[in-house]
């Protein structure tokens, strides 16, 4: 099904290339070959090893009584195994690759990316603000310079993916087949500019306010609060309030932004995947240079 949604497919292809040889690079749905190879015994063994008491976190929010929820959980899951197989997966080693896949499409889909930070990294708040400025809103640099100023793409944005021991920052854009080269050049120029030029204070203020507003809106629904609690337990082994997160965002300085931009956008760190009718397109490492 992902083959029919090229904007999803280009992300899957990028991920496969970026995390090459690691579990993070495998497609979530699997492949036809892997799914066909599943046996009843393999599924049962995986379920038994994975869905065990040490691996279980239950998050609940709303008009509830804590002790009542504890009793319900204890009763419902009392039959779960009390031990589990330890996870020994090593953090991935990223070697950025360039990939071009020809596919007859009305437009090309481009995904660029660098390594990012894990969930509990001390500079995670800086990366949140950096992403907001780069491509996280309609006032972001990519939206303004790629779409509004040059008309190269209708959809362009950046995003962060953070895991327990690694992460990534990706940039996506859909553009005309003959505009891929110019699009990549503009994105690379924006990444370099974040490294080389001090961030104006008004732009930093706008990004902080936008990010804080988004964080507050995201926690208005009970389902979002529930997911937020679960993530905190998974990655931090504790709970902390929205005020702590907002304070972390507010502490970010322009110097922090430039320092983290140098860290994330180091020369040689940028990978690229292009999907579309781009026969003969070549993307050299020099073109992706962030030095």
Explain the meaning of each model-derived region.
Residues 91-92, 124:
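Double-stranded RNA-binding/processing signature
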Residues 1-84, 100-101, 105, 111, ...:
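Charge-rich, well-structured scaffold segments of protease-associated domains
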Residues 87-89, 95:
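Long, charged amphipathic helices and adjacent flexible linkers at domain junctions
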């Amino acid at each position: 099904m992902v083959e029919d949604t090229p904007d999803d497919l280009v992300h899957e292809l990028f991920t496969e290339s970026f995390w090459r040889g690691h579990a993070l690079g495998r497609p979530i749905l699997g492949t036809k070959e892997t799914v066909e190879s599943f046996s009843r015994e393999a599924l049962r063994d995986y379920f038994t090893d994975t869905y065990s008491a040490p691996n279980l976190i239950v998050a609940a929010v709303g008009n509830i009584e804590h002790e009542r929820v504890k009793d319900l959980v204890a009763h419902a899951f009392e039959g779960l195994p009390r031990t589990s197989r330890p996870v020994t997966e090593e953090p991935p080693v990223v070697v950025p690759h360039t990939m071009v896949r020809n596919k007859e499409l009305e437009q090309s889909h481009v995904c660029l990316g660098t390594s990012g930070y894990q969930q509990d990294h001390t500079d995670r708040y800086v990366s949140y603000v950096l992403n907001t400025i780069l491509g996280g809103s309609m006032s972001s640099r990519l939206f303004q310079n790629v779409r509004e100023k040059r008309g190269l793409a209708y959809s362009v944005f950046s995003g962060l993916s953070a895991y327990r021991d690694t992460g990534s920052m990706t940039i996506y854009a859909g553009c005309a087949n003959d505009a891929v080269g110019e699009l990549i050049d503009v994105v690379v120029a924006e990444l370099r500019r974040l490294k080389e030029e001090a961030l104006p204070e008004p732009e930093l203020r706008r990004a902080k306010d936008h990010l804080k507003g988004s964080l507050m809106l995201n926690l208005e629904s009970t389902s979002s609060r529930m997911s937020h609690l679960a993530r905190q337990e998974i990655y931090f082994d504790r709970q902390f309030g929205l005020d702590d997160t907002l304070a972390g965002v507010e502490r970010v300085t322009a110097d922090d932004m430039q320092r983290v931009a140098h860290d994330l956008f180091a020369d040689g760190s940028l990978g690229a995947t292009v999907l579309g009718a781009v026969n003969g397109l070549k993307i050299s490492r020099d073109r992706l240079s962030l030095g």
